[in-house]
């Protein structure tokens, strides 16, 4: 899309037609949040004479490369908020409204802007993730080159008139598959030239391990590098953040331009491994009374707690406190993976869960009735502990 599209036109393209319904999707409770309406009036005027979904799609198609409604539908389903699903237009409209409402709160100074340096929002790229992305880049290059060679031989090779495509591959396979793009790419990457494209080039990914001592080698293996130029005159990313307590060593950082950019993991910190959010969503649907967004009413949206998994609004739930305590018990007993992050944002009434990889996690003690687990009478009598007990 070559230009910005007015908010209400995007909402109508997603199937939310009336102005009142669009404002309900944004504010949820119009009576309670009536003071926000004045700030949405310019959006109503920006929509002009576009009052139907068809007109909205016709308007958007003028700013696209394809110039067709089917091309616009492809963008809305595959590229607009892709984490919400492909054809879930109502869910995408609700999520767009949720984002606009959050932006209005920040604009009116009712909430602070998102702290981009908070480790809640940071993800660590481990060697496995870096290798996967590198392989994907060179695999796509190799695939493109093979297809190009096949096309040249099929359409332009003199003397080839066979309609059977398999015969072409069998007779020319040595030449078609001669280039070893993936192998050569990995060789270049491990010599320091990491990345296949100019915009994916990285410096400092491959380093010689410091083995002066066991401790220095261990520290070097747990080193984190913020992808910023050491000459950048920015202060906030270099400062200590309260969210790094127990995750990042507050002392072990070099002097000079790299101060605060090169960090080291704390001794007990780990990096989470990912698992599918749909496994957790399937578990919630069978064990909790969770309501799907496409079946929810405006009354449900006003009064029920939102459930977010990996940043995607997945549904609504009625009893967040009880659900949170049950989820924590399931997590402690290993019924759901122990590295699942679960929190309840009481102010915004959102139950957040994360299953993605790269999150920094650390062990904590369980406290029941203001007593930590290692002070219980049973363990004192026995005199020994296991990790499961703690």
State what each model feature region is.
Residues 1-219, 227, 241, 266-269, ...:
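N-terminal non-catalytic structural scaffold regions of very large proteins
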Residues 220-250:
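Flexible, glycine/threonine-enriched loop-and-boundary segments that flank and lead into catalytic domains
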Residues 249, 263-264:
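Short beta-strand elements
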Residues 253:
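Short, acidic, Ser/Thr-enriched surface-loop or helix-capping motifs
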């Amino acid at each position: 899309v070559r230009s910005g599209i007015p908010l209400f036109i995007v909402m109508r393209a997603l199937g939310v037609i009336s102005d009142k319904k669009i404002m309900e999707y944004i504010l949820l409770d119009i009576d309670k949040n009536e003071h926000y309406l004045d700030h949405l009036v310019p959006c109503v005027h920006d929509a002009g004479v576009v009052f139907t979904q068809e007109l909205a799609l016709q308007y958007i198609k003028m700013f696209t490369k394809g110039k067709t409604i089917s091309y616009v539908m492809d963008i809305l389903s595959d590229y607009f908020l892709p984490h919400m699903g492909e054809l879930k237009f109502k869910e995408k409209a609700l999520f767009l409204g949720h984002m606009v409402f959050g932006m209005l709160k920040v604009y009116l100074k009712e909430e602070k802007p998102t702290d981009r340096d908070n480790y809640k929002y940071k993800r660590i790229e481990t060697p496995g993730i870096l290798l996967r992305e590198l392989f994907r880049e060179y695999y796509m290059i190799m695939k493109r080159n093979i297809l190009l060679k096949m096309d040249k031989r099929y359409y332009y090779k003199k003397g080839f008139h066979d309609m059977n495509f398999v015969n072409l591959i069998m007779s020319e396979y040595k030449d078609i598959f001669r280039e070893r793009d993936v192998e050569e790419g990995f060789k270049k990457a491990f010599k320091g030239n990491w990345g296949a494209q100019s915009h994916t080039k990285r410096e400092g990914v491959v380093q010689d391990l410091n083995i002066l001592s066991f401790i220095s080698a261990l520290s070097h293996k747990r080193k984190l590098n913020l992808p910023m130029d050491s000459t950048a005159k920015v202060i906030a990313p270099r400062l200590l953040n309260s969210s790094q307590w127990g995750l990042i060593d507050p002392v072990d950082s070099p002097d000079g331009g790299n101060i605060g950019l090169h960090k080291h993991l704390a001794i007990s910190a780990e990096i989470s491994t990912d698992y599918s959010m749909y496994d957790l969503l399937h578990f919630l649907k069978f064990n909790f009374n969770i309501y799907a967004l496409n079946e929810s009413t405006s009354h449900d949206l006003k009064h029920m707690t939102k459930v977010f998994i990996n940043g995607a609004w997945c549904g609504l739930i009625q009893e967040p406190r009880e659900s949170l305590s049950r989820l924590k018990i399931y997590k402690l007993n290993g019924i759901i993976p122990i590295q699942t992050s679960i929190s309840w944002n009481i102010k915004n009434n959102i139950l957040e869960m994360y299953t993605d990889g790269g999150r920094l996690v650390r062990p904590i003690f369980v406290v029941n009735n203001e007593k930590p687990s290692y002070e219980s009478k049973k363990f004192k009598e026995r005199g020994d502990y296991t990790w499961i007990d703690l």
